[in-house]
């Protein structure tokens, strides 16, 4: 048991999670806090984020919320400075904030629709990583995790702006892994498959589909025969940012129930 505790011990570490108020981000915040990390939850969803902070604190963890739109350059720089100033360090960045965008074929997308997805999903990752790197270096090293998707690796006949953005952050993690390895900063990407999240449920409703029926259909395409949960992804992120993952950088952690192995 002692070995397990040592492998996943995040006591004394500070983790910033973008899009941390719900779904995968919220479950990651709970998981890292349970491992001992102080968690900075960054999101535009104030009500959900404040409730999550209260939940984590009630369970003996430490969490603080900052309102942040990851597309706002000055705000990103300010918030990361405030995190480092308040806690004295930053050790982990989880780039989770993202949107899906319109489910239209490429020739029907407007440039504005395309750009909005890239602004959040790609530029947001760039801005937050850029702001975090000096603080990670000052802490003696750290870990960056970019939330990509299984569709950042394989193609799919829908939401082209989203899929392109997820391929971009996959490569950004590889480049940053090479750039900052000498500073003991690791960078990896996580590639969820079909995960039941509020964002995906809302996407189905927007398309006029019943989420339960949609997930039932989707799981027939998954070798394990079931839809994943945010906890499945949070567990993978915990591995990457903890001592257990100390020799892992530039890697792709695919958590998709076997979908991309077909």
Predicted stretch roles:
Residues 2, 137, 226-255, 260:
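C-terminal substrate-recognition "lid" of short-chain dehydrogenase/reductases
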Residues 9-39:
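Canonical Rossmann dinucleotide-binding motif of NAD(H)/NADP(H)-dependent dehydrogenases/reductases
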Residues 89, 181, 186, 248-250:
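Short, small/polar-rich loop/turn modules that mediate ligand/substrate recognition or access, typified
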Residues 104-106, 110-115, 218:
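Substrate-binding pocket helix/loop in short-chain dehydrogenase/reductase
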Residues 129, 165, 173:
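Active-site helix of classical SDR
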Residues 134, 178-179, 246:
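Alpha-helical segment proximal to the catalytic Tyr-Lys
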Residues 149:
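Residue(s) in the substrate-gating loop at a strand-loop-helix junction
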């Amino acid at each position: 048991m002692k070995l397990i505790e040592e492998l996943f011990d995040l006591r004394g570490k500070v983790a910033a999670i973008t899009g941390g108020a719900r779904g995968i981000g919220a479950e990651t915040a709970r998981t890292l806090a349970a491992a001992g990390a102080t968690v900075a939850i960054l999101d535009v969803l104030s009500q959900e984020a404040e409730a999550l902070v209260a939940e984590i604190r009630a369970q003996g963890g430490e969490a603080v919320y900052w309102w942040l739109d990851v597309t706002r350059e000055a705000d990103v720089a300010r918030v990361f400075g405030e995190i480092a100033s308040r806690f004295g360090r930053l050790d982990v960045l989880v780039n989770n904030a993202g949107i899906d965008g319109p489910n239209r074929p490429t020739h029907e997308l407007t440039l504005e629709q395309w750009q909005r997805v890239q602004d959040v999903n790609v530029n947001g990752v760039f801005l937050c990583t850029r702001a975090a790197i000096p603080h990670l270096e000052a802490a003696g090293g750290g870990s960056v995790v970019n939330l990509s998707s299984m569709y950042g690796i394989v193609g799919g006949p829908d939401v082209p702006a989203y899929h392109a953005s997820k391929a971009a952050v996959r490569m950004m993690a590889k480049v940053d892994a090479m750039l900052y390895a000498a500073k003991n900063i690791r960078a990896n990407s996580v590639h969820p498959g079909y995960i039941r999240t509020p964002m995906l449920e809302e996407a189905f409703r927007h398309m006029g589909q019943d989420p339960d029926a949609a997930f039932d259909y989707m799981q027939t395409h998954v070798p394990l025969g079931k839809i994943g949960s945010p906890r499945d992804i949070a567990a993978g992120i915990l591995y990457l940012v903890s001592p257990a993952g100390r020799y892992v950088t530039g890697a792709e952690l695919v958590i998709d129930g076997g979908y991309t192995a077909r």
